[in-house]
Structure formats: structure tokens, C-alpha cells
Amino acid sequence: FPHQLYQLYTAQPIETKPYRTEIYCRKLSSDLRWLEAVARKDADPRLVTIPGLGDAMKDLLKVFSPRHYFDAQSLSDLRPGLVDLWQIVRSYTDRLSGVYRETQFRNGIIKRSRYSLIGDRLSTASHILFLCYGNINRSAVAHALAEKRIPDAGQYFFKSAGFHPLGNRPADPRMAAIAAAEGVSMDHLRSSVLTTELTEWADIIFVMEADHVKQLSTFSQAAADKALLLGGLLADQSATEIPDPYNKSQPVYQSVYRTIDQCISGLSKLVC
């Protein structure tokens, strides 16, 4: 091709060779990403048809066909292929390191949210903040349950908030209906946006997910250090994260309500 460019530039007749047909060019890194996406089913089935893993493997085995060529790996020039392989190894190494760090972080949050340790923290706490993303489902129902289940003796004060930037929203009607059926009213609650003042007010911040601790750290490390998983109040098991039910099925809403109800019962046993 460079020689043809030279011929074109110097107005010489361009020498061409017949094109080979039915030749397929592949890229190893793209093939590996595709195989991983198929194995994970990492696509919206409404938009694409996800092949079976067997079909994907059959397609990958075509690399041994003489009609299939890698665009980077070539015996005539090893350098592009080696660069591509290095980028593949570095990409997977970075991802595995990230997964390891994330696992260690989550395990640390779970460890410090053990039921017995929460009891120790509560002995010196009076201001308790419940926190989730929107403050219309999980933290809101925890707030309502805590106000109902834990006697107001002036020792404990409860608030709730969320990371969602829009405040003053009523509780999710579906969660409010489930709570009302159990004799718990959420009608008086309106969502609050988390502020630095709220993080400073709280002695303990009960979060629903480990990622909420990361978000808290953007306010201050002191705020993140106050965070515990609400799921740590399940006395008969290790601390667990509580998923967001928003826009999910009714059974998910009911399951989340039951879990939070059990957590507040655990809190009540520790403080009453």
C-alpha cells in the first residue's frame, strides 16, 4: 500500500493485485470482550439477541481457519500483536485489582457492621440518621418504623435523608401502602437531601449499601466513618446490603419492607 501511494503521487501506473475473497479479519481483544459479554449475558435482550456460550465458542474456534486473520497478531511483524496482548493483560489485571479492592472494601463495611459492634456504637449515640439514595423507600420506611417501634424517651432522635438532589418528595406510594397495611404511616415524611450539616448532626448513619459509604466520603471521611449497614441489625446473620426496590416488582417491595422491619426490630432490642 505505501508503494501504491508512491506510484499515485508520482503519476505512475498503479500495480494492483487481485483481492482475496471470503477473508475475515479479527481482533483478539474484541473477541475476548465479546466472549465475556456472552458469558455474562451483558446486554439488554430487548435490543439484541444473545447467542449461547456454545455458539460463541464455535465462532471463536474459527480463528484456526486459514481464512481468518488477526489484524494485530502476525508472524511477519510481531510488535503490534505483542502490544495488543500487553493491553489485554493490563486491562484484565486492572479489572481484577479493582474487583479485589471492591471486595476488600465491602468486607470491611460488613465486618464493622456486626450486630455486637453496632450495640457498642449505640451506647454512646443519640442522633441516628437513615440514608439511602432517594429517601422515599428504604431510609424513609426505616425512619417511620424507628419512630413507631422505639419509645421517645429523649435519648434517641431519628432523621432520614438521601443522595437524590430533589427533596420534599412524598414516600413511594407502593412502599407507603405496604407500611400502612402493617399499621405504619409514612404520610408525614418528605424526602431530605443529604447535607454536611446532617452528617455532622448524626452519631450513626445507617446506610443500605456499601457504595453509600463511598458517597459519604465525598462529604468527609468523618461522615463515612459514622456509616454502618442497616442490614447489620439482623442479629441472626452477617450484615447484608438492602437493595433499592424503586420501580421493581411488588414482591421486591414486600421483601425490602420485611427486611427493614426486622432490622428496626433488632435496633429496638439494642436500645430499649
Label the predicted regions:
Residues 100-122, 210, 214-272:
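Phosphate-binding/catalytic loops
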Residues 25, 186, 194, 242, ...:
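Short clusters of hydrophobic/aromatic residues that line enzyme substrate/ligand-binding pockets
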